[in-house]
Amino acid sequence: MGSIGSMNKPSEGMLMGLVQYPVPIVNSRRDIEASVDRICAATAATKAGYPGMDLIVWPEYSTQGLNTKKWVTEEFLMDVEEPLFQRYAQTCKENDVWGVFSIMERNPNKNQMPYNTAVIFNNKGELALKYRKLNPWVPIEPWMPGDLGQPVCDGPGGSKLSLCICHDGMFPEQAREAAYKGCNVYIRISGYSTQVNEQWILTNRSNAWHNLMYTAAVNLAGYDGVFYYFGEGQVCNFDGTTLVQGHRNPWEIVTAEVFPKMADQARTDWGLENNIFNVGTRGYVAHPGGVKDCPYTWVKDFAAGKYHLPWEDKIKIKDGSIYGYPTTGGRFGL
C-alpha cells in the first residue's frame, strides 16, 4: 500500500475499488434495469472521484438480485451479449476503467439450468474474461456448474486476473487452479449472508497465502427482508495478510493499491514457503529436482472420476429437495 487511503494510482501496479453494493430488491424486469442504471452511474462517479482507478468490482447478484421465486425465470435471466448487459461494457469504455460484473446467464442448452456468471470488461469495453461459477452454493442455488474452467486474462498494472464467485472461494483447489495458470490477482464476488462471514475472511487470506497471489473480494451489503449481507470488501497481500477491509456499510467503496510484480517476484525468488512450487517438487534438497509423483489419494481418485468419501453413504443432504427443488434434474422453474 503506497498512499493514504489508496486514493492514487501506483506507477507500477493498479488501483482497484470494491463496491459494497446494497442488496437489490428485484421483483420485475424493470427492477433489473434500474439496478443496471445505478451500477453504471456509480461506476462513472467512482472513476470521476478516483481518476486513477484501474478496476472496479461489483458483487455477485448485484445486477439481478436474489429473488429465489423468480431468479431462474426467463423474465430475470440475461445474456452477456444483450444490450442491457452491454451497458456495462459501454460504461467501462466511456470511463476508461476495467470492471467486474455479475449476471445470471441463460444456458444455451435450453434443457439445462442457467449459469451464475461473472465477466471482466476492459477499459475499451471489450470482453476480457468470462467465467461461470464452478461450485454453486448447494443445496440453495439451482445454477448449472460452470463449463468454462478457470480462465485467466491479462489485466492492468501487470496483473493476471481470474475470477471466482462466492462459494467458489471456499475451495482451495480452485484458487490453486487459478494460480497454476498464472493468476496473481484472484477476484471473488459474492452474495453471502452473515452466517459465513468469518469463513469468507479466512479463505480470502488462505487463498492468497497458499498461492502467493493477491486476493480481492467484495460482498453485497444490507438487508433484503430475509438475510443480512455483510459487505466487508477485503484485499489480501500475497503473504496472506489483510491490506484493507471494509465494514458492513452499503455503498462503501473499499480501495487498494496492489503490485502484481511483487507477487510474481515472490514466486520466483522465494525458497522457504514457495509452496505453490514446492508441492510439485517435494524434497528437492534430498532428491535433486524434487519428487514429482502425486502422493494424494483424493487427487488421483478425482481425476479418475472415483472421488468418494469414507462417510459419503451417510451424508443426508444430496439434492435440492430441502429448498423445494425437483430431484430429476433438467430445466425447471420457468
From Swiss-Prot:
It catalyses: formamide + H2O = formate + NH4(+). The active site is at E60, K133, C166. Keywords: Hydrolase. GO terms for molecular function: formamidase activity; N-carbamoylputrescine amidase activity. The keyword Ion transport does not apply. Residues 14-260 form the CN hydrolase domain. The keyword Hydrolase applies. It comes from the Bacteria. Disulfide bonds: none annotated. InterPro entries: Aliph_Amidase/BUP, C-N_Hydrolase, C-N_Hydrolase_sf, Formamidase. SUPFAM superfamilies: Carbon-nitrogen hydrolase. Its EC number is 3.5.1.49. One of its GO terms (biological process) is putrescine biosynthetic process from arginine. Is an aliphatic amidase with a restricted substrate specificity, as it only hydrolyzes formamide. Belongs to the carbon-nitrogen hydrolase superfamily. Aliphatic amidase family. This is Formamidase. It comes from Nitratidesulfovibrio vulgaris (strain ATCC 29579 / DSM 644 / CCUG 34227 / NCIMB 8303 / VKM B-1760 / Hildenborough).
